[in-house]
């Protein structure tokens, strides 16, 4: 426990919170252009080919973003919207591409959790 004199001399240091998605620059989403669309493999216990894209953002950053859902229509020069949110088994992937906005099509034949995948309500 510091004395009052010690606190006057050296005040307590404020704890600075480090952001988990610096490329967004405190915005909820950011627009960007795909520079490369490819698949990558996850960390140790899991096995798959995860779809990811390298995206150059309007904030000047170039980040790796995950493409959620089954099937996608993205290619180089596609304009996409990204949000924060990491993929636990892909190191370095800290952003998600938002389906159903700009050049990204929604997931076809999606019936549950449609809003998360940009899918329209199916005809009854």
Swiss-Prot record:
<dbReference type="InterPro" id="IPR006032">
    <property type="entry name" value="Ribosomal_uS12"/>
</dbReference>
<keyword id="KW-0488">Methylation</keyword>
<keyword id="KW-0687">Ribonucleoprotein</keyword>
<comment type="function">
    <text>With S4 and S5 plays an important role in translational accuracy.</text>
</comment>
<keyword id="KW-0046">Antibiotic resistance</keyword>
<feature type="modified residue" description="3-methylthioaspartic acid">
    <location>
        <position position="89"/>
    </location>
</feature>
<dbReference type="GO" id="GO:0000049">
    <property type="term" value="F:tRNA binding"/>
</dbReference>
<dbReference type="InterPro" id="IPR005679">
    <property type="entry name" value="Ribosomal_uS12_bac"/>
</dbReference>
<dbReference type="InterPro" id="IPR012340">
    <property type="entry name" value="NA-bd_OB-fold"/>
</dbReference>
<keyword id="KW-0689">Ribosomal protein</keyword>
<comment type="similarity">
    <text>Belongs to the universal ribosomal protein uS12 family.</text>
</comment>
<dbReference type="GO" id="GO:0019843">
    <property type="term" value="F:rRNA binding"/>
</dbReference>
<keyword id="KW-0694">RNA-binding</keyword>
<feature type="region of interest" description="Disordered">
    <location>
        <begin position="105"/>
        <end position="124"/>
    </location>
</feature>
<keyword id="KW-0820">tRNA-binding</keyword>
<keyword id="KW-0699">rRNA-binding</keyword>
<dbReference type="GO" id="GO:0046677">
    <property type="term" value="P:response to antibiotic"/>
</dbReference>
<feature type="compositionally biased region" description="Basic residues">
    <location>
        <begin position="113"/>
        <end position="124"/>
    </location>
</feature>
<comment type="function">
    <text>Interacts with and stabilizes bases of the 16S rRNA that are involved in tRNA selection in the A site and with the mRNA backbone. Located at the interface of the 30S and 50S subunits, it traverses the body of the 30S subunit contacting proteins on the other side and probably holding the rRNA structure together. The combined cluster of proteins S8, S12 and S17 appears to hold together the shoulder and platform of the 30S subunit.</text>
</comment>
<protein>
    <recommendedName>
        <fullName>Small ribosomal subunit protein uS12</fullName>
    </recommendedName>
</protein>
<dbReference type="GO" id="GO:0006412">
    <property type="term" value="P:translation"/>
</dbReference>
<dbReference type="GO" id="GO:0003735">
    <property type="term" value="F:structural constituent of ribosome"/>
</dbReference>
<dbReference type="Pfam" id="PF00164">
    <property type="entry name" value="Ribosom_S12_S23"/>
</dbReference>
<comment type="subunit">
    <text>Part of the 30S ribosomal subunit. Contacts proteins S8 and S17. May interact with IF1 in the 30S initiation complex.</text>
</comment>
<dbReference type="GO" id="GO:0015935">
    <property type="term" value="C:small ribosomal subunit"/>
</dbReference>
């Amino acid at each position: 426990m510091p004395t009052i004199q010690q606190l006057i001399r050296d005040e307590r240091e404020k704890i600075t919170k480090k952001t988990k998605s610096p490329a967004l620059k405190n915005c909820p989403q950011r627009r960007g252009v795909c520079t490369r669309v490819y698949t990558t493999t996850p960390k140790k216990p899991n096995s798959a080919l995860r779809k990811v894209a390298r995206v150059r953002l309007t904030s000047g950053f170039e980040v790796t973003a995950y493409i959620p859902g089954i099937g996608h229509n993205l290619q180089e020069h596609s304009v996409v919207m990204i949000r924060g949110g990491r993929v636990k088994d892909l190191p370095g992937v800290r952003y998600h591409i938002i389906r159903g906005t700009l050049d990204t099509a929604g997931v076809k034949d999606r019936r549950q959790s449609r809003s998360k995948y940009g899918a329209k309500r199916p005809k009854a």
